[in-house]
């Protein structure tokens, strides 16, 4: 199955929390899987790497929880990101989408089954916003 696409907005210094809901059915039964959420720099180096073994990503039957702590987001360097632009992130419950200007990184969300099958579930762009406070 091809990966779905979804973009995210991440504010440096803020906790990043998202819940990804999966389509009902046997493919959503991933509680026993392992997973990773990796945000990549333009040179393919990792800006953020979360795994089910370390922390930051939790797989459930039917949904995935992602959390990047404020300490981790505060340590993100945008020095290797050359692209900037506007990111639009969908909102829940038919609300208007969110948008922000920032540096553009990319990410992949992958899971691995108990039999070793690796599947990329989501890919997209992460808009990294340095500060929303004018100083």
Language-model features: where?
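N-terminal assembly/attachment segments of tailed bacteriophage virion structural proteins
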Residues: 1-135
């Amino acid at each position: 199955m091809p990966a779905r696409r979804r973009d995210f907005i991440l504010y440096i210094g803020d906790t990043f929390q998202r819940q990804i809901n999966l389509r009902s059915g046997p493919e959503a039964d991933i509680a026993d899987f392992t997973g990773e959420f990796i945000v990549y720099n333009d040179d393919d180096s990792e800006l953020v790497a979360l795994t089910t073994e370390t922390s930051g990503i939790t797989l459930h039957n039917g949904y995935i929880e992602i959390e990047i702590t404020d300490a981790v987001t505060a340590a993100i360097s945008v020095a290797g990101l050359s692209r900037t632009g506007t990111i639009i992130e969908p909102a829940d419950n038919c609300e208007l989408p969110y948008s922000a200007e920032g540096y553009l990184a990319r990410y992949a969300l992958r899971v691995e089954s108990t039999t070793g099958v690796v599947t990329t579930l989501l890919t997209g762009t992460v808009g990294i916003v340095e500060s929303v406070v004018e100083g």
